[in-house]
Amino acid sequence: MSEKHPGPLVVEGKLTDAERMKLESNYLRGTIAEDLNDGLTGGFKGDNFLLIRFHGMYQQDDRDIRAERAEQKLEPRHAMLLRCRLPGGVITTKQWQAIDKFAGENTIYGSIRLTNRQTFQFHGILKKNVKPVHQMLHSVGLDALATANDMNRNVLCTSNPYESQLHAEAYEWAKKISEHLLPRTRAYAEIWLDQEKVATTDEEPILGQTYLPRKFKTTVVIPPQNDIDLHANDMNFVAIAENGKLVGFNLLVGGGLSIEHGNKKTYARTASEFGYLPLEHTLAVAEAVVTTQRDWGNRTDRKNAKTKYTLERVGVETFKAEVERRAGIKFEPIRPYEFTGRGDRIGWVKGIDDNWHLTLFIENGRILDYPGRPLKTGLLEIAKIHKGDFRITANQNLIIAGVPESEKAKIEKIAKESGLMNAVTPQRENSMACVSFPTCPLAMAEAERFLPSFIDNIDNLMVKHGVSDEHIVMRVTGCPNGCGRAMLAEVGLVGKAPGRYNLHLGGNRIGTRIPRMYKENITEPEILASLDELIGRWAKEREAGEGFGDFTVRAGIIRPVLDPARDLWD
């Protein structure tokens, strides 16, 4: 819908059942506490199945054994995924030791999964361990509040270990924004931390009694790195610095990648520039964006409820004017900024504070002791001696941050002995997948388990065509919800069915263009045959410094997506 013909500010109609659930939940309590004591099932029932998401958990089951258990007349092997709230991805070594211990002793899979939302997840928490995991997190100053469902999720912040002063300032703002937009209900503390019920009535001055219409994602990004993939997020604060000091932010609103196969009312969308704001208005503006989306977002259709759809319905200028009105400011013109990349700098980087930072490539973010590569044990050993902190990146990697020169050799020795510094190709460093099977209930095709061998094949093609020192930003997501951020990749695979994917081309290296579907519902051999031909052409015909995605557009292989709300599906 164009600016000239804006739609209604509020969508009238029958509200979704999720709205009923939130309203009746008594500020997210439901009957979760009672359900915890029901030993007849390993899962949560009724509304509680969805309400636990507000407490940072998803109920899942092992899909590899689902059919087998059904044959045995057993319920699915229910277990929870828990996602920690960790603004900016910074975690202390004491906290790391606690989560390592819990993962090893109290989860089915024994792993820590770093995510591209800059936090960690536990998979396979049985119901009896759900309360203990929240209490363990609390004991080391962490929580899982608002990391899922209709709230402001974990706030991302560029992992920039080199410019330590600027990163420190941006990180503080990521924490402040996260805290400011948290729900105020005491449900989390009452249910998981056994804090006593207080007679006062809960109030949610920012989120409201029915919270947001849909999930909401926020970033703080420090150019020229776009490692956090700004355009995948609802609200983005782009850091503007003068003489290395943060002075304000450019605000971009309305990005998001989730689509539904065949539903042309859904689309991925890049965020729209609203303007520049000085630092002192940051929290007021963040609150204004969230409350405008709270009041104007579509509560009659969850597939059309995110901020990107609200912007398209009411018009960018209308939404922006409402944010200005609520925040009591006028945006200044956007200040100049540019992105040059979004990958992590793997290996040692010296910061301007003379400390060293070691970025470790963790394939798919999965930390486990593999045969000959005890990654989990290695990181635990480093955590025991390292005086700085760890930082999870939005590329699912891990930074050992703030290493003094005197400790460098000791940490490198452990990292090398544990397989944490094994050499990988540039292509593998720039490839990513979501979890998908066996734990994700939405998975349509493999992603995390598919990626390593798929990249082996891509590496072979890169060698064949003489471009093995290059990379293509390549991502696999197991379903169109898009957790793997394939809809901002140069080559994006979106799961369609077991062993089949939609192949998207035409994104760019810096993550500012949505790719278009090139081929639908194809197998791995068909994908590789297409990419063999196209990588060969790119190797021969590209211009100096031209990335694969830009080449596919310039060469006319794929039409660029210019206005996704209108031309993504053309």
Curated annotation (Swiss-Prot):
E.C. number(s) listed in UniProt: 1.8.1.2
Entry GO MF terms: 4 iron, 4 sulfur cluster binding; heme binding; metal ion binding; NADP binding; sulfite reductase (ferredoxin) activity; sulfite reductase (NADPH) activity
Short name of any one Pfam family annotated for the protein: NIR_SIR_ferr
Cofactor(s) this protein cannot do without: siroheme; [4Fe-4S] cluster
Catalytic activity: hydrogen sulfide + 3 NADP(+) + 3 H2O = sulfite + 3 NADPH + 4 H(+)
InterPro entries referenced in this protein's UniProt entry, alphabetically: CysI (IPR011786), NiRdtase/SiRdtase_haem-b_fer (IPR005117), Nit/Sulf_reduc_fer-like_dom_sf (IPR036136), NO2/SO3_Rdtase_4Fe4S_dom (IPR006067), NO2/SO3_Rdtase_4Fe4S_prot (IPR045169), NO2/SO3_Rdtase_4Fe4S_sf (IPR045854), NO2/SO3_Rdtase_FeS/sirohaem_BS (IPR006066)
Source superkingdom: Bacteria
Binding locations of [4Fe-4S] cluster: C434, C440, C479, C483
One GO term (biological process): sulfate assimilation
Sorted UniProt keywords: 4Fe-4S, Amino-acid biosynthesis, Cysteine biosynthesis, Heme, Iron, Iron-sulfur, Metal-binding, NADP, Oxidoreductase
Cofactor, free-text remark: Binds 1 siroheme per subunit. Binds 1 [4Fe-4S] cluster per subunit.
Enzyme class per UniProt: oxidoreductase
Pathway terms, separated by semicolons: Sulfur metabolism; hydrogen sulfide biosynthesis; hydrogen sulfide from sulfite (NADPH route): step 1/1
GO CC terms: sulfite reductase complex (NADPH)
Xref: Gene3D superfamilies: Sulfite Reductase Hemoprotein, domain 1
Annotated siroheme binding sites: C483
Family: Belongs to the nitrite and sulfite reductase 4Fe-4S domain family.
Biological role stated in the UniProt entry: Component of the sulfite reductase complex that catalyzes the 6-electron reduction of sulfite to sulfide. This is one of several activities required for the biosynthesis of L-cysteine from sulfate.
Oligomer status and interactors: Alpha(8)-beta(8). The alpha component is a flavoprotein, the beta component is a hemoprotein.
Protein name: Sulfite reductase [NADPH] hemoprotein beta-component
Upper taxonomic lineage: Bacteria, Pseudomonadati, Pseudomonadota, Gammaproteobacteria, Enterobacterales
